Each structure stands twice: as structure tokens, then as C-alpha cells.
Amino acid sequence: MGEFKVHRVRFFNYVPSGIRCVAYNNQSNRLAVSRTDGTVEIYNLSANYFQEKFFPGHESRATEALCWAEGQRLFSAGLNGEIMEYDLQALNIKYAMDAFGGPIWSMAASPSGSQLLVGCEDGSVKLFQITPDKIQFERNFDRQKSRILSLSWHPSGTHIAAGSIDYISVFDVKSGSAVHKMIVDRQYMGVSKRKCIVWGVAFLSDGTIISVDSAGKVQFWDSATGTLVKSHLIANADVQSIAVADQEDSFVVGTAEGTVFHFQLVPVTSNSSEKQWVRTKPFQHHTHDVRTVAHSPTALISGGTDTHLVFRPLMEKVEVKNYDAALRKITFPHRCLISCSKKRQLLLFQFAHHLELWRLGSTVATGKNGDTLPLSKNADHLLHLKTKGPENIICSCISPCGSWIAYSTVSRFFLYRLNYEHDNISLKRVSKMPAFLRSALQILFSEDSTKLFVASNQGALHIVQLSGGSFKHLHAFQPQSGTVEAMCLLAVSPDGNWLAASGTSAGVHVYNVKQLKLHCTVPAYNFPVTAMAIAPNTNNLVIAHSDQQVFEYSIPDKQYTDWSRTVQKQGFHHLWLQRDTPITHISFHPKRPMHILLHDAYMFCIIDKSLPLPNDKTLLYNPFPPTNESDVIRRRTAHAFKISKIYKPLLFMDLLDERTLVAVERPLDDIIAQLPPPIKKKKFGT
């Protein structure tokens, strides 16, 4: 692997927002996740659980409900009283409609997907018809005395259940009238509570309604008679969420204590046809409230205040050992929040509402391999750039020379010129940005910092010439297919001649920057692109996909390289393919053209294309790389993959020069330390 001086950075104080709600789409096997800052993320569970899309948050959009309807249409609602639909191609909000019922606490799509229900602060339940372009208000149901906190349709679509404070209502959909009102027991551990909040309801085909509430109970109701059938006290705190499997043979609930409980419908005796609900498995994968749960055919999904998105596999449902067979926790976004100015040794950190610019520390000390060297000069926090307005930052970038910073929100694009005088820094905003640069999904500077490449949310790729403190728009590449396809990843060649762009359809287009035309399109692949980069000298495009495959494509020759064909013929090591975090960054060594540097959240890897590929019998994570020419045994076992797991969780890693690396880590304990305290539990013997 070689020896590097490594800047080990741990001052990126990034804390993901907590998870508020999730919605699973069985047709597409995708999961929508809403966070407390209003951000909505889309995970493709068929593509190794990759976060393929996201919609940036907004301070006034506290999302309380999320659901899929009409197959691939995604809706959300929140405390601002609006219902929103998302454009999954252009990655923006199609429209927002006021429901005129105050804050919205719950939402559910009908079994047919053609209707949408919302539960409001004023006690109203509103029914909307889903039309091809929008949603249309149909009618109100009988208004209740308190806010509607949870909703569930009967699978036939004829009735709905609505959870409120102290009671559950059953409505007839055709008439909109309440046919039953079931009072929830306020008793908690023998003491009568002031209020009992019904956080979740689930309406089953046989007419059973399952409710979860703030008294720590899971209760079963007969909707035909409006009576309580059975009650389970499972927690000393709120049971906040519930999700039922499509087959209605199991369901999952989440509690404020961080525990997830699995219930299954099992026969009363081995030969009996009669079945009953039994609590079978408790799981403790969270430290804080489990605010939301989902149930896929093969896993229990949960999320909450501790920011983790947890997939717990149901091993009896997993047929073969694959991506679905592993417990996984997703904490960090599958995109890069850090950019680097190698020339000035600067790091730009992206947060939701501000940017931070840091200069790396330095040392004059020397030592042997593995030593930690004392700093002669500490890292400097040079700049804190706060956004104006309620919108989250979508993307940001600092130029390689360190003289430009660009970032974008949903409605505005910002470009700044930086000037350095000794230890002082001055910032000047470039004014009068053109209207077509209103918003960007991805930003990238050329290696010489003279050009800025901007992927707009309308599918166009803009090239901007930078000179002094001004800019000039050179060209715009329009979407190839005629439809708006958001470009999520950009890569530019070091010589500035080639620009690669990857869109939401997993295709990669390569443009000739000098001739301002499309050069070629990389052959389509079934899995999304997670990272890509263009190598110096050869102009080979290296592409990493969510299934852990890595391809090398020759841009001048418009074909895969011989090395890439060899890799696809022989195949990657099975341990490499079983990794559950995507590659998020690729770079190259300036003096070693055969080396590819890449990393995910838990490993840093150098691929040496001059060495043979490891087979499945070879030790992939080889702890003994060759140290000198006489080390014959080690050289015989050497293979192309040199992997280090020292740095983790690893959010960014890149070469500053041929002998220096920078690694940005974010320990999970540091994140948990900044979260609100969890519910205090009494331990035995204390």
C-alpha cells in the first residue's frame, strides 16, 4: 500500500437529523424516509439498500406522515398543514396543497392507491382523490373532538380506523360517518394517566384493529362490536409506531425505550387451526425513541431519534444468503458532504444550514510507521458561512485552488470569491447570478479552478467560466432523453476536457468540454452509481455501483478497459461483494497510474491494477502487504486489493499530495453524545 502521512480529522461535528417516519413500497421495493429537518430520502432495497435520491429539508416543513400511492407516487404531510407530492425524476416538489385543517398528524393511502386520507389538528379526517397530475379534495368525515394522530384503511377500502386522544373511531368511507367509538383504557401500571394517546392503528382484513398507545400497550379490538379483545402491556413508556406485514401474519411495534417488538400469528396448539397473536422477539438496536417502523417481506425496519435506520432481517423469510440476510444500520448519507482544496490544504464541511471552512494543521515532527505526531500548528476554523432562509443546503464545493466556494439551496445558487492575506480571509459574493442557475443538485470545479460545472434540477448541465471575481456562462448540455432527469454525480478529468454525469436512471453520459457535445454514453447497468472519477493521463472513467462492482471505462476509446474486462470475467472476491456500505469517493495517485483509491464508511482501499485479483480462497483483508523486495512469501500472496479499516466511520478520504492523505472520521459515540438524553431505565440492583 505504501506509507502516507495521514491527517486524521475528527472536528466535522456532523449530526444527522432524527428519523420521523418511513414508508415502504412493496411494488418497487423502495423505502421513503423522512427526517425531523424535513429531508426525505429514498432507499432502493433491491440495490444493496442504497440511498439513491433525497429531497432537502426545510425549517417550516416538519414532516409527520409519509406514504406511497398509485404505485410510484410519494406524498408527505406535516405540521404546516400542507400535503406535498414529490417528483422522483427531477428531485423536487411537484406541488404543495393546504388541507385547511391545521397541522396534519397522519396520512394513509387507500388499498387501491386512488385515494388519500389525512388526519388534522382540528379533529377532521379529509379524503382526497388522487388524479393523474394532482390531488383533489373529495369530502370531510365526521369531525372528532381532538387531533387525529393515526389512520389505517381496512384492506377492502370500505372502512377506516382513526386513533386520537383517549379513543379510536371507525368510519364508513362511503358515508363519512363514525360507526364506532372505542374508549382506550387510561390505566398505566395500575395508575390512571391523564391522557392516553393512540399513536398508531392497523386495520386487518378480519375486522381486527390493533392499536398502540402512550400507556405502553398493544391492544386488539373488534371493529364490528367496538369492544376490546386483548391487551398486551409491553413497555414502561409510549409505544409509538406499528406496521403490519402484507400477509397479516406478523407486525412490528416500536417503543420510546428504543425497543422493537415483533408479534406473530401462530397456532394455539400444534394441530389447531385456531391462531393467536404472540409477542415473539424483542430487539434493542436503538438507544432512543423508535418513532417509526415498517415491515418488508424480509425485514423489520425501524428508525428514530438516534438517527439510525435499522434493517433487521427475518431469517425465516430469507431464502439465500445475500444482502437481505445481514443486520444493517444506516447512519450517514450515501453522498459526500466534504470537499477539499489540495493546494491550500482546506476542507469545506457542509451542514444543513451553514458551511465551515477549515485549514488543516501541520507538524515538523518525524516518526516511524503508526506513530501519532504532535502538531506544531493546530487546525484553523477560517470561515462559518450561514445560509439565509429556511431551506437546507443541497450541495457545496470548494475549488482546488481554494479561491471559490459555491453552494445551492432549492431556490438559490451562491458563488463566493475568497481572498487570503496571511492569516486573514475575506469573502465576496458574486452577485447577479443568472436565472437558469437558480438551483443545483451537484457542483464541481475543474482541476485548474477556471470552470464551474453545475447540474441543475431541470436536468441541464451548465459550464461557467471563472475569471478574477466574475463569471461567464459558456454552455448548457440539455437532458438526452427529452425528459427531466436529475444528474446526481459529476466527474471532470484533470485536463478539463471531459465531463461525466450520472443521473437518476443509473446511466452515465460523457461530454466533450472543448467541443461542447456529447461524446458517449457508458453501457447501462442495473445498479445505481455511487461514485465515479476520471483518471489523469489515461482519461479512464472509474465507476462504482451499489452492488460493489467497479468498472473502468476508456473515454477516448469508448469501451471498457482490458483490466475491467478481466475483473468482470474473474469476478470480485465474495467478501468485497458482501460489504453493506457503498463506495462514496474515488481518487487517483498522481505518480502511480496503476493505483485506484476508494473508500466507503468502514474501509479505505487501494486497488493496484498491476497485481493479480484475489480469488475467493485468498485472504482479502491481507494484514501483511509486501515490505521489501526480499520478502518473497509476502509478495507471492500479494494481490490487487490493499484495505485498511483503521479509519471509521469514514466520511471522506483523499490524497493531498503523493505522500499525504486526509481522513475525516465521525465516531458514532460523538453523535450519540449530542442527542437528547434517552428515557432513563431503572437497572437491576440500583
From Swiss-Prot:
Cross-link type Glycyl lysine isopeptide (Lys-Gly) (interchain with G-Cter in SUMO2), placed at K321
Stored InterPro entries: UTP4 (IPR046351), WD40/YVTN_repeat-like_dom_sf (IPR015943), WD40_repeat_dom_sf (IPR036322), WD40_rpt (IPR001680)
Instruction: Indicate whether Transcription appears among the record's keywords.
Output: yes
One GO BP annotation is: maturation of SSU-rRNA
What PANTHER family does the database record attribute to this sequence? Answer: U3 SMALL NUCLEOLAR RNA-ASSOCIATED PROTEIN 4 HOMOLOG
Q: Quaternary arrangement and interactors, per the entry? A: Interacts with HIVEP1 Interacts with NOL11. Part of the small subunit (SSU) processome, composed of more than 70 proteins and the RNA chaperone small nucleolar RNA (snoRNA) U3. May be a component of the proposed t-UTP subcomplex of the ribosomal small subunit (SSU) processome containing at least UTP4, WDR43, HEATR1, UTP15, WDR75.
This protein's name = U3 small nucleolar RNA-associated protein 4 homolog
